[in-house]
Regions:
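Short amphipathic alpha-helix that is part of the acyltransferase structural core
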Residues: 1-42, 50-52, 59-60
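Pocket-edge structural micro-motifs
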Residues: 6-8, 67, 98
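Secondary-structure boundary elements
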Residues: 12, 26, 56-57, 121-130
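Short acidic (Asp/Glu) patches
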Residues: 33-40, 44-47, 73-85
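Short, well-ordered loop/turn elements at secondary-structure boundaries
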Residues: 46-48, 128-129
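Short beta-strand micro-motifs in enzyme catalytic cores
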Residues: 47-51, 92
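Short, His- and charge-rich active-site/binding loops that engage polyanionic ligands
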Residues: 52-86
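Acyl-donor binding region in acyl/amide transferases
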Residues: 73-149
């Protein structure tokens, strides 16, 4: 049985960030590093949460929620004007990033949607965010458009 939840231990964070590293490296989005972790400056901030989908003790999917704060959000590097417009309207927002899934999982789409739903509900009802952004690599845009509309 797969369970989706907020990562609550350092071990879960490490497993999640290792999965992000593995998936990003396999798809050519990230080069090798000796720690085999994909850690961004945002992961070091208290305004960031990591979510995991686990089967037994194995992390099979992960997503990171970055709330707008000290460093802004990751998408701001590409979409400065759009993010600045939202901020000027006093919108409270965040970004889902590092959304990955281990390949070959049964019910991949359902797992993906369950994890995404959890992160969005947490953002809305626990963190009281008005909006949540999800920036996608160009080769994944058609998937997100098909699945999320």
């Amino acid at each position: 049985m797969i369970t989706c939840r907020l990562a609550s231990t350092i071990e879960e964070w490490v497993k999640a960030l290792r999965l992000v590293y593995q998936v990003y490296q396999q798809t050519g989005l990230w080069g090798p590093n000796r720690y085999q972790l994909r850690v961004t400056p945002y992961h070091l901030l208290p305004s960031t949460d990591v979510f995991v989908a686990t089967e037994h003790a194995t992390v099979v999917a992960s997503a990171t929620l970055v709330r707008d704060g000290l460093l802004g959000i990751p998408a701001e590097a590409t979409y400065q004007r759009e993010i600045r417009d939202h901020r000027s309207k006093k919108r409270v927002f965040g970004e889902i990033t590092c959304l990955v899934m281990k390949g070959g999982e049964q019910g991949e789409l359902n797992l993906f949607l369950s994890l995404l739903r959890l992160v969005v509900q947490y953002a809305r009802y626990t963190e009281h965010l008005d909006e949540v952004f999800l920036a996608a690599h160009p080769r994944h845009i058609s998937f997100y458009q098909r699945v999320l509309g």
